[in-house]
Amino acid sequence: MASVESRIIAITGGASGIGAATCRLLAERGAAVLCVCDISPKNFDDLKISIKKINPSTKVHCATVDVTSSVEVRQWIEGIISDFGDLHGAVNAAGIAQGAGMRNTPTIAEEVDEEWTRIMNTNLNGVFYCTREEVRAMKGLPATDRSIVNVGSIASVSHMPDVYAYGTSKGACAYFTTCVAADAFPLGIRINNVSPGVTNTPMLPQFAPMAKTFEEIEESYKKEGLSLIEAEDVARTIVWLLSEDSRPVFGANINVGACMP
């Protein structure tokens, strides 16, 4: 079982979905401090309560951060170092979805500038800002195994013609991760990317806005050859990458969940 005992971990998008599932598993595996940020504070109290039930020894520090702002990201990471003196790992899980099935073919003709820019700012620029500040912080700390995990999507490798901005942002995230992994590895910082398949999170309905029930959403994905997984399935892979059990692994893009090629 992958252990993160006594570690200080930063998690973006940590108040819900994959981020929250990762927080819960990190607490179960003995993390000392979870520094959680999200664009909305509405789920912070529920997260703290759930973590306390799992492991009363794990401290949870929550902050409202917009990852599309490099200034806010920098202040958040600098605050972690100032408050706790270390940063062993980070999970960049903040992201936004793009609705499918609402546009006429060819769907590219209806892609609008504002939607493209909005998604790129969060899913790509946000990952860049966070990874950059995490590496900046980690390189000045004592040498030990340090790990950063970026959360992408199976859309980065699966051909999905109605989610251009989302798929492109996640493909760029995977490529960025492999590049920066080679750059940071000599410093003892491992960086990897996880690409989940269709995951049962609060963001799921945004991908299928025409569906009225969860069953309709699940059935629509089955027709496309996609299987539904749980956030906890992804969290187990993320926590493994944060642990010393994955020490030889860097620059990887790990798919979690089945999908249509």
From Swiss-Prot:
One BP annotation, GO: alkaloid metabolic process
Keywords from the UniProt entry: Alkaloid metabolism, NADP, Oxidoreductase
Pfam families given in the database record: adh_short (PF00106)
Stored Gene3D superfamilies: NAD(P)-binding Rossmann-like Domain (3.40.50.720)
CDD domains per record: SDR_c
Catalytic reaction annotation: chanoclavine-I + NAD(+) = chanoclavine-I aldehyde + NADH + H(+)
Pathway annotation from the record: Alkaloid biosynthesis; ergot alkaloid biosynthesis
TM ranges: none
EC number(s) per entry: 1.1.1.332
Residue positions binding NADP(+): 18, 48, 66, 132, 166, 170, 201
Induction section of the entry: The expression of the ergot alkaloid synthesis cluster which leads to the synthesis of fumigaclavines is positively regulated by the brlA and stuA transcription factors.
InterPro entries: NAD(P)-bd_dom_sf (IPR036291), SDR_fam (IPR002347)
Gene Ontology molecular-function annotations: oxidoreductase activity; oxidoreductase activity, acting on the CH-OH group of donors, NAD or NADP as acceptor
Biotechnology: applications noted: Ergot alkaloids are known for their toxic effects on humans who consume contaminated grains or livestock that graze on grasses harboring ergot alkaloid-producing fungi. Due to their strong affinity for monoamine neurotransmitter receptors they may also have clinical uses such as treatment of migraines, Parkinson's disease and cerebrovascular insufficiency.
Active site, per annotation: 166, 170
The protein's role, per its UniProt record: Chanoclavine-I dehydrogenase; part of the gene cluster that mediates the biosynthesis of fumiclavanine C, a fungal ergot alkaloid. DmaW catalyzes the first step of ergot alkaloid biosynthesis by condensing dimethylallyl diphosphate (DMAP) and tryptophan to form 4-dimethylallyl-L-tryptophan. The second step is catalyzed by the methyltransferase easF that methylates 4-dimethylallyl-L-tryptophan in the presence of S-adenosyl-L-methionine, resulting in the formation of 4-dimethylallyl-L-abrine.
Protein family (similarity comment): Belongs to the short-chain dehydrogenases/reductases (SDR) family.
Name this protein carries in UniProt: Chanoclavine-I dehydrogenase easD
Gene that this sequence comes from: easD
